[in-house]
């Protein structure tokens, strides 16, 4: 029987959901905590789970304070991160956390290369690339795929203003290496000035992530922009959402082996549609019926091509349709974009089973 090793944070929803699914399709995964992989810099020499042939899946390292500290230490080993307060939700040097994660992923790549008996479901360097929104957009644009206009690294490093109504009157600013809409700021220019919709909360000198989408203006908005700029920002032209069921809509396309296997409509009254931020899954058939088949197939083709830009079995591709559905853009590609409890294909398989069947085929 094929062995499965899961690098994850035990006890988190993602880890538990995957383990339950694996047991259901007849595989008992061996869970190796990120807390054991990160301090070793991705070196697997002392981790016996990797000595024998196995499929290796990496799960998100999020939702674990101890792991956050380890990532910070991997990014800056000269600071005693254990003594630094880390209240729940606080965005503590997210750019540095990413630097630490990249170093670990680089180490994992070397470890996998030295162990041909292991079959990682994603190249660690592809995971790092997908987490870098600016790099991802550049890759997608180079592949000829439709994306929002965005500021180049040269513009971000220069004196180009991040918000300029003469450039874009609707502008999205995101933590360049964030996930799940952490550090998201959607701005629109009004006669009274810029108004932002955000998941960032600034209080007592600290910036936190909040699940309560809120509106910011004036000095509060400026502080959020300054925070994003310090930590590494992706700045995109805001694209108007197509409306479904009277709400803003976009689409998550989960690709397995470069092929779309799941499409989830996300609807929200806000410009930020993530399901954990008040968005909801749209009724699939009703939403699908609203989109002419030609434009639907065009979007799926773009999602497939976007996933194909990265060496990963699984990619969650975010696609936005403009009003009328004739035009679409690829917004992001998510390395860990397959967590949709309750989804099933016509054969009754959940996403994890679909992925495992692809591995075994």
Language-model features and meaning:
Residues 1-5:
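Extreme N-terminal starter segment of soluble prokaryotic enzymes
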Residues 166-275:
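Phosphate-binding site of ATP-dependent enzymes
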Residues 276-314, 321-361:
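C-terminal active-site "lid" helix and adjoining low-complexity regulatory extension at the edge
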């Amino acid at each position: 029987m094929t062995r499965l090793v899961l690098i994850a944070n035990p006890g988190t929803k993602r880890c538990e959901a995957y383990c339950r699914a694996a047991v259901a399709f007849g595989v008992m995964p061996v869970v190796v905590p990120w807390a054991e992989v990160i301090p070793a810099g991705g070196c697997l020499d002392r981790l016996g789970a990797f000595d024998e042939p196995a499929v290796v899946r990496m799960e998100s390292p999020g939702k674990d304070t101890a792991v956050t500290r380890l990532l910070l230490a991997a990014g800056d080993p000269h600071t005693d991160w254990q003594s630094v307060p880390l209240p729940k939700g606080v965005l503590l040097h997210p750019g540095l956390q990413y630097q630490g994660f990249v170093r670990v992923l680089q180490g994992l790549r070397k470890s996998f290369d030295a162990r041909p008996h292991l079959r990682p479901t994603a190249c660690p360097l592809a995971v790092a690339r997908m987490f870098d929104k600016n790099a991802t957009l550049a890759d997608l644009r180079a592949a000829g795929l439709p994306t929002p206009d965005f500021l180049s690294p040269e513009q971000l490093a220069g004196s180009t203003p991040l918000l300029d109504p003469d450039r874009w009157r609707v502008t999205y600013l995101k933590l360049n290496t964030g996930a799940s809409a952490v550090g998201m700021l959607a701005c629109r220019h009004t006669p009274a000035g810029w108004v932002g919709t955000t998941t960032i909360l600034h209080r007592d000198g600290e910036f936190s992530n909040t699940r309560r989408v809120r509106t910011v203006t004036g000095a509060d908005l400026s502080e959020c922009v300054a925070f994003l700029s310090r930590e590494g920002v992706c700045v995109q032209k805001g694209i108007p959402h197509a409306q479904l069921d009277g709400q803003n809509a976009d689409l998550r396309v989960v690709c397995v082996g470069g092929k779309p296997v799941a499409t989830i409509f996300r609807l929200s009254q806000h410009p930020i549609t993530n399901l954990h931020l008040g968005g909801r899954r749209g009724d699939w058939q009703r939403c699908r019926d609203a989109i002419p088949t030609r434009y639907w197939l065009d979007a799926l083709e773009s999602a497939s091509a976007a996933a194909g830009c990265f060496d990963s079995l699984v990619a969650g591709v975010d696609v936005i349709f403009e009003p009328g559905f004739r035009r679409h853009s690829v917004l992001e590609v998510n390395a860990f974009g397959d967590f949709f409890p309750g989804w099933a294909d016509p054969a009754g398989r959940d996403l994890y089973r679909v992925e495992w069947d692809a591995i075994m085929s």
